[in-house]
Structure formats: structure tokens, C-alpha cells
Amino acid sequence: MTTVTSAPLVRAINWNIIEDDKDLEVWNRLTSNFWLPEKVPLSNDIPAWQALSPMEQQLTIRVFTGLTLLDTIQNTAGAPALMNDALTPHEEAVMSNISFMEAVHARSYSSIFSTLCQTKDVDAAYAWSEENAPLQRKAELMLEYYRADEPLKKKIASVFLESFLFYSGFWLPMYFSSRGKLTNTADLIRLIIRDEAVHGYYIGYKY
């Protein structure tokens, strides 16, 4: 006798019936904050970039490369891992938005590189990021938590990444901006900071 197993029921998301109003609140905040790096006039920073010393340029490129690595992890591993642990389709939707914006953030650093930097210097920074033991260890630790089957620890790790791991890298462009350097680049970073503040808040709230 053949046993027929019915397929699991698939339900469409209904934003008119929500278990947690915070999901809609954060969704609306994220969508109203939407932006793309192409809208920021980074080319206005070319004179300021050229006035930086070679050491300052190298430091800036390396900082942004490190941030790109973290954004890549959050886009491809972190947010998807949290999405898998979501309790409702509304949580899944918010996490999918967060995942996409992390990809936008990573794209933003490439926009900075292509506008201000020489290709050889950027290539050297990417090679450095792959060879730098502390940076790679930081990435490995995040991935260990995201790949494990412990939902609460994933959220804790994600909040740490969305807060001090990112923000420690944001200090340099804010420092330059406070001195009238790379001000348009700093405007782009402020858009990223605005996003990360919401990401960290939401994930921490769900914890």
C-alpha cells in the first residue's frame, strides 16, 4: 500500500494580520530609508582624497575593505541565518530587507574605491584582508555562530557585528569629515550608520 504524504501548507504573507507590530514599524523605517550609493556625489571628494598622504589613503582603503568583508558576511550568512530562525513571515521579510541593504553597503565601498582610488591600491587592500590574521579570525568567529544551530547566539553575534564591529570602522571617515576631508564619503557612511542602527535595534529587540 502506498502512503501519500501531503506537501506542507504554504501561506502567503499577510501584512494586515501581524503578530508583532514592531515588524511593520521596522519594515516601514527601512523602506523609507532606502538609498543607493550612486546618488551620493563621491567624485566631489577627489581633491580631498588626493591631498591625503599615502599612509592615510592606505589606511582608509583597508578600513573600508574590512567593512566590506563584514557586510559580505552579514549579507550572505548572517541575515539569511536569522531569516531561517524567524518565527513569522513578517520577520522573514524584514530580515530579507536587512540582507539586501548589507549588499548595498558592500557595493557602496566599491563605489568609493572606483571613484577615488587606484585599482592597484584597492587590489592590494583586498589581498591584505585575506592575509590579515586578526581580520580573518573576526570573520571566522562570526561565521561559526551563524552556522551553528543556536538561534539566540546568532542574534547576539549579529548585534555585536551591527554595533561595535561596524562602528569601530566608521570612526575614521567621521574623523576626516570633522576636519573637512572626504565629506561626501562621510555622508555615504552616515547613510550606512543609519541603516545599521535600525538593524542592530531590530535584531536586539527580537532577542
List the model feature ranges, each with a label.
Residues 1-207:
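Non-heme di-metal
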